[in-house]
Amino acid sequence: PPLYSSAASDVYKRQIQKGDVTVENLLAQDPDVVVMTLDQKKAAEESGFLADMDSAGLRYAFIDFRQDPLEHTAASMSLLGGLLDKDDRAAKFNDFYSQKVRTVTERVAGIEDRPDTLVWMAAGFNDCCSLAGDANIGKLVTAAGGHNLGPEVLGTDSSQITAEKLVELNPEKLIVTGGEWARDPNKTETYRHVELGYQADEKTAVETCAGPLQIPGIDLLDAPKTGNYYALYHQFYDNPFNVFALEAIAKWLHPEEFADVDPATDFEQFHADWLPYDYSGTFFIDPAHADS
């Protein structure tokens, strides 16, 4: 994407196409270290890929922002800081991150009300309905003072349920994730996903919140009718800036306790302080109160 290619042009030119990652083409890049996600570890071990890397003398490390974001983000950033000779910057980020997390978790510690909540991943883009279980955004719901129903239905990770099951669960709070995805031309029946991201404007984001609700049966849910339906940028699910999703979820679940928190403003300032590209777009939407 232009956002990344302009910020890190040298790295962008050296990308390996999906499916072409072999020890041979990694060696051709002559890396100091290969960084992989924790999601890849088991498959890499079982396939013998790590053994092949060891034999070739390739160094590697694993990071995780997805499986357990609140536990692994700081450790992953410290690891990256060490690898990139940016220990001080990583430590500064972790101080910032930890304070943000504490602001949320300390406030919700005394709140007894834990609203039943579901996170519907890529609603309207993927087939209905993929839920966040006890991982990524599902973990954030729990930390933000919600009762994430996902693990009780799914187990430990995101997976599918039917629209009928979603209606049966009928959560008090419904959060969907949206993004900037191209429509699949092979799908004969596709409902519009929520447009969120760096190129999304608020008006379009609000309008497209209606898309997932057009799936047959979803109109029976109470949350959209009671103003408890929200949309979040999908890429927060696997990113070190997941803490802004935590803020948004806490504000949606407990609006009075987090009336002073403004995730959009905080995220914009984060770009100015930490990122090599400018803030733009829309990342959080509460369609029932978008004009307030």
Q: Locations of the language-model features?
A:
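Flexible, solvent-exposed loop/hinge segments that line or gate ligand/substrate-binding clefts
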Residues: L169-Y230, Q235
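A residue-level marker of the well-folded mature domains of exported/periplasmic proteins
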Residues: S130-L131, G138-L140, I161-L169, I249
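Short, structured coil segments at secondary-structure junctions
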Residues: A7, S55-G57, A144, K225
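Extracytoplasmic substrate-binding proteins
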Residues: V33, E45-C129, G150, S158, ...
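His/Asp/Glu-enriched short active-site or ligand-binding loop at hydrolase and phosphoryl-transfer sites
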Residues: D134-T156, Y230
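Single conserved hydrophobic/aromatic residue that forms the stacking wall/gate
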Residues: P1-A8, Y12
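Proline-aspartate-enriched helix->loop->beta-strand connector
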Residues: K13-K18, T22-D39, A163-E180
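Alpha-helical scaffolding within the catalytic cores
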Residues: V21, G48, S159-K165, P212-D219
